[in-house]
């Protein structure tokens, strides 16, 4: 499927200061001359800041990484996780429509999107808050049907729960990601039948949802100040340099 940039583009893009610091930190993960390896995380952060990727954002990332603009454009147009047109300012719902989710009710979730958001995918709701699209498998087949918002999964949905989810976002709340039917992760609905000792050390939510809660790393991120700048690899780099033999 051919993907192009949206015809209406802003004049400029600038990373917010905290996001710029985060981006510069990501670049240090890679050896000199390999900065292009940071292209996906930088594009993702630009999208988290703006909601979608604009041409000026691609140009900014290309300049930061010393890449030709066309190379960054190739990445952005190849991966469907990158939005190339405006989306709802609160949430863009990606509804998985592949086999497991389809069998378990994805079409019903799409009907909810058409009723409560917009009749066509990628159209923005009248209040400007939401948009939606159907996507291919998101790898949460054991928790079908589900939707993705940014990097958060909302799983084990019914039409009622999904409708309530949209209402929660509309009211300014951010529902906790993960299973929405009371399941911890992807265990059988009746509960674990083996490896039960694991539950003794379990966190309140499963690992991905717990991380989102602990770091306040949710769909509400805008400028990067909402979460701490974590760069554990820098201390390892400094330690390894100290261990190098002197010449």
What do these predicted ranges mean?
Residues 1-247:
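Signature of N-terminal electron-transfer/Fe-S-associated modules in redox systems
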């Amino acid at each position: 499927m051919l993907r192009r940039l949206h015809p209406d583009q802003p004049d400029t893009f600038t990373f917010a200061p905290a996001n710029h610091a985060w981006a510069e930190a990501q670049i240090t993960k890679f050896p000199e001359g390999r900065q292009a390896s940071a292209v996906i995380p930088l594009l993702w952060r630009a999208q988290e800041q703006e909601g979608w990727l604009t041409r000026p954002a691609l140009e900014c990332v290309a300049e930061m990484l010393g890449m030709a603009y066309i190379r960054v454009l190739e990445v952005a147009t190849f991966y469907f996780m990158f939005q190339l047109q405006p989306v709802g300012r609160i949430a863009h719902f990606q509804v998985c429509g592949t086999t497991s989710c389809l069998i378990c009710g994805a079409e019903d979730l799409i009907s909810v999107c058409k009723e409560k958001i917009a009749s066509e995918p990628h159209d923005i709701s009248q209040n400007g808050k939401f948009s939606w699209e159907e996507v291919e498998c998101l790898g949460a087949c054991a928790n079908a049907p589900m939707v993705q918002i940014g990097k958060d999964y909302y799983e084990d949905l019914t039409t009622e729960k999904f409708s309530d989810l949209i209402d929660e976002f509309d009211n300014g709340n951010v529902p906790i990601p993960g299973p929405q039917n009371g399941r911890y992760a992807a265990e059988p609905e009746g509960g674990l039948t083996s490896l039960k000792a694991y539950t003794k050390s379990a966190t309140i939510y499963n690992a991905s949802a717990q991380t989102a809660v602990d770091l306040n790393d949710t769909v509400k991120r805008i400028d990067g100040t909402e979460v701490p700048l974590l760069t554990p690899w820098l201390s390892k780099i400094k330690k390894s340099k100290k261990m190098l033999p002197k010449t």
